[in-house]
Amino acid sequence: MIDNTWAGGVLFKALEHGIDISIQAGTKYLVGHSDIMIGTAVANTRTWDKLREHSYLMGQMVDADSAYTTARGIRTLGVRLKQHHESSLKVAKWLSEQPQVKAVYHPALPSCPGHENFKRDFTGASGLFSFELHKRLNDEELSAFMDNFELFTMAYSWGGFESLILCNQAEEIAKIRPGIERKLTGSLIRLHIGFEDTDELIADLQAGFDRIK
């Protein structure tokens, strides 16, 4: 089983790669507007009957409005994911050229670990990626950087039309993923690139960097 939310369920063909069950938070890219809570599961013929039986036994169901809204979102999924890919890659390329940035973790960039696997297995990228700063932001710098964006909003969820930002410190990541091979030293910034003008998003990030010089 795999969580296929980052790829919107379509940028990575899970069942074609031998995976039995592909799940995703439809709340994100399937719906596309961050206004419905729904999850989906797709299975191959070998596991579908058992999955469906468990779903019935647990009484899982979704209301009609959520089902309709999700179905409507799926109609524009391909167009939206294409825009997420193009916009996020443009921002990622710009970030990779900034002196404050140590590394950009966007799988479509050749410099990103796992890029070859991405090229082999995926048909595109979504809007979610992260970048690491050369330094660890102290509390004052973190507040100056994160609290004053014009377009980016601090929020955990993603997959909608809006651009979002979060920060995690290296020690926080180490606690969450103690077995990670690539050890972080600087602050890690997570971005979700939505449908705002990319030049304006870049200007917003540049203003953030200017605040921590």
Regions found by a protein language model. Give the residues of each.
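Well-ordered beta-strand positions enriched in small/hydrophobic/aromatic, beta-favoring residues
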Residues: 39-41, 129, 165
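PLP-dependent enzyme catalytic core of the Aspartate aminotransferase-like
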Residues: 135-137, 163-213
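Conserved small-domain helix->loop->beta segment predominantly found in fold-type I
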Residues: 89-150, 154-159, 173-180
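Short, flexible turn/loop "capping" segments at secondary-structure junctions
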Residues: 32, 64-66, 121-124, 181-186
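Hydrophobic side chains in well-ordered alpha-helices
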Residues: 51, 141-145, 201-205
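Short, well-ordered beta-strand elements within core beta-sheets of diverse protein domains
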Residues: 70-79, 126-135, 190-194
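Conserved PLP-enzyme active-site core in the AAT-like
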Residues: 1-100, 105
